[in-house]
């Protein structure tokens, strides 16, 4: 979805790229949407198609279409199956997200409205929106569903799909939405879910903060508070709205900045907000209305606010409704921005804020109240529709889309959505909202088109009547805002787009944030004159307003009108123009383009297929067309919200009110579609639509203008929800009665009828058969039962045995651990005290490291004698195998200090084979017991403490002068210790043996341990032998080795020093002792630290190649011959002690050192052979 959205964004960004495809895509989208829509309902499908077409045209981008289709489908599906199938919802949502095109959104919108209508006119609107988005944006559901959530989930918004997945969230969002929709809990909830989801995405997107749908809604409402309604709606559709209205500034203040301006708007629109409260109340009264109040708070406020807004707008430059709108846009934008910004999180709620704003907007629209009103109408309806559509569009396209649908769902959601939805989908949602409104006006398709055009062309905008007013302003602003918004959107939104349309909007804080804030922005937008025209447009406008505020107040106006779309500048660009396109290019792009383009497309589509689109309006144009019709339709659907809410207040008959508002602006114009739909039918249809929206009729009613087409689709849409429920209703078959009577007998079985369902029956669930005793079937069953029983018994026995074995193993492990601890303690006590600080911890490691260095350094191996390599072959399978790179061969070689190894090797190898064998067997048994599972854990723990000290001591003591003298010991110990974790630890594990080496398999560890134990036993038993080895053989061997390997080792040491990995490995491991000394502090410590991990790798790779060659070399070569000799002599006593301690330690931690043993053994054999050679 995100990709799609981005793509959409890109498309949108491309400007009209989306738009161009709009018509064609529109059709295609329609077709596509149809599938999604179809899923939803015939009507829905059509509407969806139309909307999708528009949306797709806008969003056409694969994402858009898919999103559209999915969005629509989902929305529809959600609406219909919202209650019936949350899963479906999710599916739908997924579906929706895929399309998530404005069309889809529209469809969703329309569907949402219809579906919502099904559930509850207004609520359904909201619900659908909520639900659809919810469903549709389960992942983003909350996003859309909950304005708050949406906002909060604003980011989710970008990923509609996620919203998809979070169907669950939709409910939450739904619920939050409910709060948001405080008006219509029931519808609210689903709407909330839906709306919120839609919106949230937007909201979320750009308003991640408002995770809480409530906040969002509150914001929305608070934003609306700006429109009073917002706050009010959350408070209570009525009281809250009224309070909001009154407290709009205050409430609006919830997002003070946005609210403040909105309050201004809101203040201006305060009346509207009060209207909105009425809307809320009415909405509350009318479910459709209720959500609309919530949703429509903008709308409703929009409606009332149109007057207020007018003031606001006037204040804002609402006079022109366009000019004012821009200012309102600006003002709202500030609001929106403030609100959007501040309320961005609340942004979704901002929708309501927008609502207030829209109210103000409507006033602005007051100039063009008709259009604005119409938008309010449309906005209300359209807003709902547009919101829905927008939401749908946005939701589809974006979470915003969802958000949009959300607010189309309910205006609060729309607002929210616009804000929330639109925030994410700002431009688009806004545009869609506006476009929808625009297109809602498209009821006068012209307006839709005009709207689109207006968006695109301010000129056409005027024709859009109310929308025109809003849109004309919007167009101008659209471009302006679109552009600014675009800029904002682009600039801000552009980046944010991915994040969320809203964010970009949000980014373009000014208006984008606000558009994102869309809700806030919407609030702004709402204040936006067009806001009134489009409540949702106010959304849009808010968005735009935001945008407008941002860049172009006009855009704001446009924003309002287009803001839905423009809100996402994207939307606007398409709808409005290039800027819109540009705006739209950016995140909103998909939405915007979808919105804008779709707006254009949708508008065009609406214009073109206002009937179809209107019908489809719910689906797509319904965003606009639907918005218009939706204004009618939504008005009808939402109008209830609006009408009941604000409309009642402002336009009591939202349709009428809307009409009033819309008609004021361009009742005729806007009215044509919206009034037509909204005014006449809308009032009825509005409430009815919203109300009826649930019922397909409502939808159509919703779109009287759209009626032809929209009615067609909306009914289908509405039917779809029922359809979904119908299956649940499933069948008329009488309830099953338990009869348990034999119904049939065959040779082998007797069939009993367990349940009697009257004329229906299910062989699977209603009948069961009992095999006759003598039959084959009975025998088979008996055999099967017996077999199962036997198997179960056997399994139980085996399990018990395994349990006992595990217990034994655990006991052995514990014993091993205890022994290991004891040996570690001894080793630590012995060595740690002396070299504990610097060598103590590291000592064990260093010894291992030498070995590991040896094993680790392939160069040594490569250069080393073939004989060593051959010898290493013996151990290679375990020790050297890459799989066992942690094997002793690594560390095994280094596991026992090279010095010790050298000393021990002679003793081990020189010791009587038979004795050694016996010792090995004894040690093997001992090790096996200890090694089992216990050491693996302890070793790691001990490794740093014990393993490190022992080996570290060894290496350092051995090379005590060298290692300790350089001071690397200290570094080593600590660097090792610190870095020891990874590097040293592995080395320790390697050196310490299997116990410390988790990499080794148990078998490998045992083998290594055994070898190590043997060697250690041979050597350990005879300290003198070990000393002898240390002093004599090791030196002897080392000398010869030193000569043969010294170059290599030194080179390696140098390489190690120079090479990050090698320095660690070489200095520490291969040439670790000498190298360490030569490159003691810097190279070794640092390499170790930096290469703890690397060394492991190096050990693994180089070890394989050079572990054995290195081992002898590492013993002798790592240090210069002189160094080694000096170290060995100087520390021969120390080495002896270390050897003993190490042996003890190893014995205690056989696993640790065992593993090294195999490698060591090879190493020893190598050393022995080599020593023999040189010797």
Curated annotation (Swiss-Prot):
The keyword Repeat does not apply. Residues 503-553 are annotated as: Involved in binding BAIAP2. The modification Phosphothreonine is found at residues 638, 654. Keywords: Acetylation, Cell junction, Cytoplasm, Isopeptide bond, Methylation, Nucleus, Phosphoprotein, Transcription, Transcription regulation, Ubl conjugation. Residues 864-879 are annotated as: Required for interaction with FAT1. Residues 240-253, 262-273, 378-396, 547-584 have a biased composition (Low complexity). Phosphorylated in vitro by MAPK8/JNK1 on Ser-724. The modification Asymmetric dimethylarginine is found at residue 1100. A motif (Nuclear export signal) lies at residues 1018-1026. InterPro entries: Atrophin-1, Atrophin-like. Residues 158-174, 208-217, 345-374, 527-539, 693-703, 722-737 have a biased composition (Pro residues). Residues 17-29, 45-63, 108-128, 780-824, 914-932 have a biased composition (Basic and acidic residues). Induction: In vascular smooth muscle, induced by angiotensin II, FGF; PGF and IL1B. The record marks 109-110 as: Cleavage. The modification Phosphoserine is found at residues 34, 77, 79, 101, 103, 107, 617, 646, 724, 731, 733, 881. PANTHER family: ATROPHIN-1, ATROPHIN-RELATED. A mouse model of DRPLA with 129 CAG repeats (Q129) exhibits severe neurological defects similar to those of juvenile-onset DRPLA patients including age-dependent and region-specific presynaptic dysfunction in the globus pallidus and cerebellum. Progressive shrinkage of distal dendrites of Purkinje cells and decreased currents through alpha-amino-3-hydroxy-5-methyl-4-isoxazolepropionic acid and gamma-aminobutyrate type A receptors in CA1 neurons is observed. There is progressive brain atrophy. This is Atrophin-1.
């Amino acid at each position: 979805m995100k990709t799609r959205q981005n793509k959409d964004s890109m498309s949108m960004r491309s400007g009209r790229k989306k738009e161009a495809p709009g018509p064609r895509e529109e059709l295609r989208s329609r077709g596509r949407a149809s599938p999604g829509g179809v899923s939803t309902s015939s009507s829905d499908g059509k509407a969806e198609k139309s909307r999708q077409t528009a949306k797709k045209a806008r969003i056409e981008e694969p994402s858009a279409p898919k999103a559209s289709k999915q969005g629509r489908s989902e929305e529809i599906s959600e609406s219909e199956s919202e209650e019936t199938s949350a899963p479906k919802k999710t599916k739908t949502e997924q579906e929706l997200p895929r399309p998530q095109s404005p069309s889809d959104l529209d469809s969703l919108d329309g569907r949402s409205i219809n579906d919502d209508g099904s559930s509850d006119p207004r609520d359904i609107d909201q619900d659908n929106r909520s639900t659809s988005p919810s469903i549709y944006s389960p992942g983003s559901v909350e996003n859309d569903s909950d304005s708050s959530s949406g906002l909060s989930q604003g980011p989710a918004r970008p990923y509609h799909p996620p919203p998809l997945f979070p169907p669950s969230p939709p409910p939450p969002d739904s619920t939050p939405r409910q709060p948001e929709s405080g008006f219509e809990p029931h519808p609210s909830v689903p709407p909330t879910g839906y709306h919120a989801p839609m919106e949230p995405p937007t909201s979320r997107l750009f308003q991640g903060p408002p995770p809480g749908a409530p906040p969002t809604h509150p914001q929305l409402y608070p934003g609306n508070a700006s429109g009073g309604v917002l706050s009010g709606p959350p408070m209570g559709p009525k009281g809250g709205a009224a309070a909001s209205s009154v407290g709009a500034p205050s409430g609006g203040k919830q997002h003070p900045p946005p609210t403040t301006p909105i309050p201004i708007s809101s203040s201006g629109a305060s009346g509207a907000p009060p209207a909105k409260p009425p809307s809320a109340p009415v909405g509350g009264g009318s479910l459709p209305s209720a959500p609309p109040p919530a949703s429509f708070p903008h709308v409703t406020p929009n409606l009332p606010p149109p007057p207020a807004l007018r003031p606001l707008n006037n204040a804002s430059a609402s006079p022109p409704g366009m000019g004012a709108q821009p200012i309102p846009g600006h003002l709202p934008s500030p609001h929106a921005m403030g609100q959007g910004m501040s309320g961005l999180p609340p942004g979704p709620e901002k929708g309501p804020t927008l609502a207030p704003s829209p109210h103000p907007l409507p006033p602005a629209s007051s100039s063009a109240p008709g259009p604005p009103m119409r938008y309010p109408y449309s906005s209300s309806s359209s807003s709902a529709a547009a919101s829905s559509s927008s939401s749908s569009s946005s939701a589809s396209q974006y979470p915003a889309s969802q958000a949009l649908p959300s607010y189309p769902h309910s205006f609060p959601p729309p607002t929210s959505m616009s804000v929330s939805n639109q925030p994410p989908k700002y431009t688009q949602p806004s545009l869609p909202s506006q476009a929808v409104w625009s297109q809602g006006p498209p009821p006068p398709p012209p307006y839709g088109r005009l709207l689109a055009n207006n968006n695109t062309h301010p000129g056409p905008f005027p024709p859009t009547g109310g929308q025109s007013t809003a849109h004309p302003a919007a167009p101008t602003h659209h471009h302006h805002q679109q552009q600014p918004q675009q800029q904002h959107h682009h600039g801000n939104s552009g980046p944010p787009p991915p994040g969320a349309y809203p964010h970009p909007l949000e980014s373009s804080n000014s208006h984008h944030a606000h558009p994102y804030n869309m809700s806030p922005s919407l609030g702004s937008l709402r204040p936006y004159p067009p806001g009134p025209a489009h409540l949702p447009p106010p959304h849009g406008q808010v968005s735009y307003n935001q945008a407008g505020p941002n860049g172009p107040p006009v855009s704001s106006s446009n924003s309002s009108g287009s803001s839905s779309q423009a809100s996402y500048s994207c939307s606007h660009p398409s709808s409005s123009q290039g800027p819109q396109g540009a705006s739209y290019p950016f995140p909103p792009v998909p939405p915007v383009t979808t919105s804008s383009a779709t707006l254009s497309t949708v508008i065009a589509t609406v214009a073109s297929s206002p009937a179809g689109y209107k019908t489809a309006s719910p689906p797509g144009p319904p965003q606009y067309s639907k918005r218009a019709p939706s204004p009618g339709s939504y008005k009808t659907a939402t109008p209830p919200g609006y009408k009941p809410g604000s409309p009642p207040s402002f336009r009591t008959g939202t349709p009428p009110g809307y009409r009033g508002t819309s008609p004021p602006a361009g009742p005729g114009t806007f009215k044509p579609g919206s009034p037509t739909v909204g005014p006449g039918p809308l009032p009825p249809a509005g409430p009815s639509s919203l109300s009826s929206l649930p019922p397909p009729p409502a939808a159509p009613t919703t779109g009287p203008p759209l009626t032809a087409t929209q009615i067609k689709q909306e009914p289908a849409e509405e039917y779809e929800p029922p359809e979904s429920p119908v299956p649940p209703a499933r069948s008329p078959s009488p309830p099953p009665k338990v009869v348990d009577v034999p119904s049939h007998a065959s040779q082998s079985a007797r069939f009993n009828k367990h349940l009697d369902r009257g004329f229906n029956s299910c062989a699977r669930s209603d009948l069961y058969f009992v095999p006759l005793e003598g039959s084959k079937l009975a025998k088979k069953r008996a055999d099967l039962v017996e077999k199962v029983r036997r198997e179960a018994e056997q399994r139980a026995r085996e399990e018990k045995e395994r349990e006992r074995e595990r217990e034994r193993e655990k006991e052995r492990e514990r014993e091993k651990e205890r022994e290991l601890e004891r040996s570690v303690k001894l080793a630590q006590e012995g060595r740690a005290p002396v070299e504990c600080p610097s060598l103590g911890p590291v000592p064990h490691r260093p010894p291992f490291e030498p070995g590991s260095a040896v094993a680790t350094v392939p160069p040594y191996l490569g250069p080393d004698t073939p004989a060593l390599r051959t010898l290493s072959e013996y151990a290679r399978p375990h020790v050297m195998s890459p799989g066992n790179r942690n094997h002793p061969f690594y560390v095994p070689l280094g596991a026992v200090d090279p010095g010790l190894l050298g000393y021990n090797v002679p003793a081990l190898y020189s010791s009587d084979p038979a004795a050694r064998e016996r010792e090995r067997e004894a040690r093997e048994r001992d090790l096996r017991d200890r090694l089992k599972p216990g050491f693996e854990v302890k070793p790691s723990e001990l490794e740093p403490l014990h393993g490190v000290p022992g080996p570290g001591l060894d290496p350092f003591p051995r090379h005590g002068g060298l290692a300790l003298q350089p001071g690397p010991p200290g570094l080593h110990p600590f660097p090792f210790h610190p870095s020891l974790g990874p590097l040293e630890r592995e080395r320790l594990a390697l050196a310490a043996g299997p116990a410390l080496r988790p990499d080794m398999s148990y078998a490998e560890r045992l083998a290594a341990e055994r070898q190590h134990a043997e060697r250690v036993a041979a050597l350990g038993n005879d300290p003198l032998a070990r000393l002898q080895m240390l002093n004599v053989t090791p030196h002897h061997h080392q000398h010869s080795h030193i000569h043969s390997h010294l170059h290599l080792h030194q080179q390696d040491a140098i390489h190690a020093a120079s090479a990050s990995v090698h320095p660690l490995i070489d200095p520490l491991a291969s040439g670790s002792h000498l190298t360490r000394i030569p490159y003691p502090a810097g190279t070794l410590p640092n390499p170790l630290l930096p290469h703890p991990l690397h060394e492991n790798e190096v050990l693994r790779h180089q070890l394989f190649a050079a572990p054995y060659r290195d081992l002898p070399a590492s013993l002798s070569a790592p240090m210069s011959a002189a160094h080694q000799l000096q170290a060995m002599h100087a520390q021969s006593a120390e080495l002896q002690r270390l050897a003993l301690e190490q042996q003890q330690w190893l014995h205690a931690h056989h696993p640790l050192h065992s593993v090294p043993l195999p490698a060591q053994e090879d190493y020893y054999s190598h050393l022995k052979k080599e020593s023999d050679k040189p010797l």
